């Protein structure tokens, strides 16, 4: 397979910079590290309890694998709020793309990550507004920008990698489109 991580990463970052606005100063979030960390722990635990209450996920993950994934996820998401310069940001973007690809292997779908991040964002916005009152809007905007980028990069990495792997094994775009069309027809949509 002639696909490299750097190739996938560069393609995704180029697209993100083309479609997204300029990054905000994410380092301002480090001032609220304790509040953010506590909120992340609470939300990730709640969401993992929800996700792992379904039979499908119970069959994919045993309890130890679930705890390992949960702790890894908490630690990683907290890293979002330790970005202090462009170099940190670039490394963090690479980590998001790597995780987007690795989660393909773990059956941890992008929609799980998206659900967790949206819930974290909602909870953090409320807590920041309680703590900062009228000064909260700038920080909430920065938080919103950062988390949207995480979701965008994660989904793009998952889809880009999956597409390249399927192309490599001979399942091209036309075959994928025809399979989707057949699925839509079978569902009567």
UniProtKB/Swiss-Prot annotation:
Highest taxon above the source species: Archaea
Gene3D superfamilies per UniProt: Globins (1.10.490.10)
Record protein name field: Uncharacterized protein MJ1356
Annotated organism of origin: Methanocaldococcus jannaschii (strain ATCC 43067 / DSM 2661 / JAL-1 / JCM 10045 / NBRC 100440) (Methanococcus jannaschii)
GO molecular function: heme binding; oxygen binding
Pfam families hit by this protein: Protoglobin
Family affiliation: To M.jannaschii MJ1461.
